[in-house]
A protein has these predicted regions:
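Helix-start/capping segments and mature chain N-termini
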Residues: 1-77, 81-88, 112-308
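Residue-level recognition of the N-termini of beta-strands and the immediately preceding loop/turn
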Residues: 99-101, 140
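Short secondary-structure junctions
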Residues: 91-99, 235
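Short loop/turn motifs enriched for small/polar and acidic residues
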Residues: 104-108
Length: 308
């Protein structure tokens, strides 16, 4: 049977249960110190095939296992365990719509910030409450935040953990207070890094340009997807260091991530990007992204995992 959002089924500590019945100890290290790592895994409904596809599921687990290793959590689950639990809980909800599925490995018990365990996991599917195409057409007015992106010298941005998002929150709150939609971070060297939960791309002279992975950015699966899609479309992709002022004079720009997909940047620090609208290349890439996520591109069919 299908469940309401308020009573959807989640996978929690080895069981599938009502989300309201999942309880975590308030003194657990995950509650007190943010000791957790996670993935936001998108699923897309293919209406023609009546099939729900998880997008790049194995790649998300590869990254999750890297985060677990770097944070040093003693996780009792293998990638195969995680994948089975993921499919089981999404099936249990009988979803026939687009989803974002939060899969989190956390440190439970009564330990401190130095504890490796006991560790456990929850998987919570969340229906996407908006039509991606309409949302992504609106675009974003951004600022360069005064906060610098965390670097590999303190807490690496390549780790997808709850604690890292405090840095993201600082930049996002500053942007909202000053009337912007979101922000773009510079790294410790004053070069362009990424958004608070998204990677940055710009279009300059017909080329798609994005910061290097060593410029303090997440090893983003969406970033990798866009690079591969662009190359398949014969678009030249350049990974390099980007100066702040290049943002103000680029032809197009967008932020991307599993949740926001590909969302155009209309302005940065009130400098209008291009003509202030969704750029043609950005729009083409977003369409290609959605087609790939729904299993419609033969070349990238291996990126999708059927749920039913």
């Amino acid at each position: 049977m299908k469940y309401s959002v308020e009573h959807r089924r989640i996978w929690f500590k080895g069981e599938i249960l009502d989300i309201n019945d999942a309880k975590i100890n308030i003194m657990a290290p995950t509650s007190q110190f943010g000791l957790n790592v996670f993935e936001g895994i998108p699923c897309y409904w293919n209406e023609e095939e009546k099939q729900l596809y998880a997008f790049r599921l194995d790649d998300h687990y590869e990254r999750l296992m890297r985060s677990i290793k770097l944070i040093q959590i003693d996780c009792p689950y293998s990638k195969e365990d995680m994948k089975k639990a993921f499919i089981d809980v999404v099936r249990a909800n009988e979803y026939d719509e687009n989803l974002s599925v939060r899969q989190t490995v956390f440190v439970d018990g009564f330990g401190s910030w130095g504890s490796e365990g006991p560790a456990d996991m929850f998987i919570a599917p969340v229906p996407k409450g908006r039509m991606s195409k309409e949302y992504n057409k609106k675009g974003l007015n951004c600022c360069i935040t005064s906060w610098r992106r965390i670097s590999d010298q303190n807490l690496s941005p390549r780790i997808k953990c709850g604690a890292n998002y405090i840095n993201s929150r600082a930049g996002q709150r500053e942007a909202l207070r000053n009337g912007y939609d979101t922000c773009i971070f510079l790294n410790e060297f004053g070069k362009v890094a990424e958004g608070p939960g998204s990677c940055f791309f710009m279009v300059k002279d017909g080329k798609l340009v994005t910061p290097l992975l060593t410029d303090a950015v997440l090893e983003s699966i969406t970033r990798d997807t866009i690079i591969k899609l662009a190359k398949s479309m014969n678009i030249e992709v350049v990974e390099r260091t980007i100066d702040r002022t290049e943002l103000y004079t680029c032809d197009e720009a967008f932020l991307c991530g599993s949740a926001m997909e590909i969302t155009p940047v209309l302005s940065v620090d009130k400098y209008v990007i291009g003509n202030g609208e969704n750029g043609s290349l950005t729009e083409k890439l977003h369409k290609e992204y959605l087609d790939a996520a729904r299993g419609l591109i033969k070349e990238f069919k291996n990126w999708v995992t059927p749920i039913y």
